[in-house]
Amino acid sequence: MIEGIPPGGRGALFIGGTWRPPSGGRYSPVVDPSTGLALGEAPVATVEDARAAADSAAENEERWARVPGHERARILRGAADRLAADRETMARLIASEVGKPITDARVEVDRAVGVYRLAAEEIRQLGGESFPADAYERPAGNENRFLFTVRDPIGVVVAIGPFNFPLNLLSHKVAPALAAGNPVVVKPTSAAPFTALRLAEHLTAAGIPPGVLNVVVGPGDPVGDALVEHPATRLVSFTGSTSVGKRIAERAGRHAKRVILEMGGLDPLVVLEDAPLDAVVGATVRGTFGYSGQVCTASKRLLVHESIADAFGRALAERARSLRVGPALDEQTEVGPVIDGASVERLERLVEDARGRSASVLAGGSRVSIRGGSFYAPTVLDHVPEDALVVREEPFGPIAPILRFSAVDDAVRIANATPYGLQAAVYTKDLSRGLALAKRIHAGGVHLNDPTNLRWDALPFGGIRESGLGREGLRYAMQEMTEVKLISINYAGS
């Protein structure tokens, strides 16, 4: 039994400060992608459980909002300390639940520790503005008024997390919500419930009062829908697919609720003819094959100038073939499994479609058989046409499709020929050309001479178009999770 999984292998729901079984008595298996074997069982919450969690959060809304900011900061720092002390157990839990190589899983824990510490710091920066009242003619009497704004907690926040970063991306929702004075209902992915449940243990031990943090595990329909539509919930923060994000936005919109959506992407990496080849290949290996490509900011379309495309393809294929594919808990593994067998089948379909459209396979292109796990070889495709499915659908796997271009205008057109717009990257020695391209590419972030998958936890992160709404990044998420209130004071005759 992996440490961190409850005795008996069954998880529980966390509602109102107590652990309880799902009211319907149902559980679903949690499968290790590296082996295909069950790690334990996730509780399957009911609509009644979801409503109870939202009710519990609502009952404690005012209580948590009244906790002084310095006390909330102390609790968040305590949670960070507990996570840091539990680093190895958390990392092994992540690796086992979602197949992330253990070396990467440790980095995820470290990033999450930093998120809680940053959230504690940002509490001091969450302020309002003052205004020169006498600068406004109307209403009359402004020379005797003082005007300022404050930020109030928005209310109950629903945090819906993905499988690929079951600790860090969930923390990017939970930490700013708590820091801003909001209670939270967490719905982690059913593929990785134990990471979220252990996080709840650490937050509770650090001092989060009962009912302020609640965790329910279950399918989006009906459990997620019940949370989104509950009268007490005021904001939904979601990371996942665009189709599910749209569904959440539609349902939240019916009740005028705010959403933060981090959704899909087809992030382009543009390689100009003067780019340093070794640096670009190294960045592509990290940006495309890291965590088996199951990253929303992975480099999913490699737009390479035709003059260097042959050399780039050969070098990337050589690196791809050298990557060690293996179980997540193996310290030597560089590329682990994808999340499940259905993902392997989808990758096979995308590669077969590309082959049928005259793309060539330079490396990989097939599944890898290792102890019953769901593995797919790091794959490099060349001469990929623009109508291939692999560059129209987010693959979420270790596939590097190369699209060749001859003119910069063509590169921009191809980069923008997608409904998404999360991240992008441009490699060139000419920074003026790079900056010009950065302005023309439609994305929430553009990196020059760095891979697409960079993220700074304290800085704004998010997409445009169908990649998302709103921004994460501690300060920016806290702004989304608060309401601006204007206060006026008339001191005439006081």
Which residues are covered by each model-predicted region?
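Conserved C-terminal structural/oligomerization subdomain of aldehyde/semialdehyde dehydrogenase
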Residues: 35-41, 233, 270, 324, ...
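Rossmann-like NAD(P) dinucleotide-binding subdomain of oxidoreductase/dehydrogenase enzymes
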Residues: 128-279, 405
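Short, well-ordered beta-strand elements within core beta-sheets of diverse protein domains
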Residues: 38-45, 60-66, 158-159, 269-272, ...
